[in-house]
């Protein structure tokens, strides 16, 4: 009976130890952490960057590998589009041929790639997998890519912003110019009624003021011409 009790006590004592080892094992298994953007939006013909970063408890060696895969919408089939091990190996077949570029740096924990000349057909889910032995088990983040055309609304917003930057200052200048001209006209009428005659100094000041007003008017015209040219280039 005493032997059974001793064996039972030893067995019970093993449970806390196994628990510690188990939790330590879980910590080691997930010591490689990978992060990527959940959603990325791009436009047709404009280069898109798919960002992926990782943190590993082990030093980076030539055994580190990076794999990017692509899954089309409404499909369970995935295809490899990029592989890295000491050197980058973008896919040489399929729709992504000659369009995948390496823009990462493994020594900085960056496993990002870019897609050139994207099209609407590139919409889908991209996955980034990193293995850095002995860290080989990790989460697999997924990025949902949405590629669209730059529509009229996007161009219109750019034109609206340009209009605000050009027209608002011009409107302020014109308003100030009109106020000054109105005050000057009112003063001239008042002086003409009272038979007042200007001195040579006042005549000189009026000439300088007229030149300043003419300069401001030319500035407004230049701003309007600049806006017209930018608007034509946009469309």
UniProtKB/Swiss-Prot annotation:
Looking at the keywords, is Cell inner membrane present?
no
Signal peptide span? 1-31
Enumerate the glycosylated residues. 123
Q: Where in the cell is it found?
A: Membrane
Could you name the Gene Ontology cellular component terms for this entry?
A: plasma membrane
| Gene3D superfamilies per record | Immunoglobulins
The entry's keywords = Cell adhesion, Disulfide bond, Glycoprotein, Immunoglobulin domain, Membrane, Signal, Transmembrane, Transmembrane helix
Regions crossing the membrane:
159-179
Domain named Ig-like V-type: residues: 32-148
Entry keyword Manganese: no
- Cysteine-cysteine disulfides: 52-128
A GO BP entry: hair cycle
Spell out the InterPro entries in the cross-references: Ig-like_dom, Ig-like_dom_sf, Ig-like_fold, Ig_sub, Ig_V-set, Myelin_P0-rel
Cytoplasmic face: residue ranges? 180-235
Mapped to this chain, the residue ranges on the Extracellular side of the membrane are: 32-158
Membrane topology of this protein? Single-pass type I membrane protein
PANTHER family recorded: MYELIN P0 RELATED (PTHR13869), MYELIN PROTEIN ZERO-LIKE PROTEIN 3 (PTHR13869:SF20)
What is this protein's function?
Answer: Mediates homophilic cell-cell adhesion.
* Family in the record: Belongs to the myelin P0 protein family.
- Protein name per the record: Myelin protein zero-like protein 3
Gene name, per UniProt, is: MPZL3
């Amino acid at each position: 009976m005493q032997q059974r009790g001793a064996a039972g006590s030893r067995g019970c004592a093993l449970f806390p130890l196994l628990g510690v080892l188990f939790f330590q094992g879980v910590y080691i298994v997930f010591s490689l952490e990978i992060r990527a953007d959940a959603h990325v939006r791009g436009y047709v013909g404009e280069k898109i960057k798919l960002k992926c970063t990782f943190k590993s408890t082990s030093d980076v060696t030539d055994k580190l590998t990076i794999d990017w895969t692509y899954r089309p919408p409404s499909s369970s089939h995935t295809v490899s589009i990029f592989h890295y091990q000491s050197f980058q190996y973008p896919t040489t077949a399929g729709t992504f041929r000659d369009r995948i570029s390496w823009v990462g740096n493994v020594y900085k924990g960056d496993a990002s790639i870019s897609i050139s000349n994207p099209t609407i057909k590139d919409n889908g889910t991209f996955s980034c997998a990193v293995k850095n032995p002995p860290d080989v088990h990790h989460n697999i983040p997924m990025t949902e890519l949405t590629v669209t055309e730059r529509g009229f609304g996007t161009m219109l917003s750019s034109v609206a912003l340009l209009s605000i930057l050009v027209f608002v200052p011009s409107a302020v200048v014109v308003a100030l110019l009109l106020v000054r001209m109105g005050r000057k006209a009112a003063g001239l009428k008042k002086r003409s009624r009272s038979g007042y005659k200007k001195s040579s100094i006042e005549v000189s000041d009026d000439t300088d003021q007229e030149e300043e007003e003419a300069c401001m008017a030319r500035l407004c015209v230049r701003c309007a011409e600049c806006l017209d040219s930018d608007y034509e280039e946009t469309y």
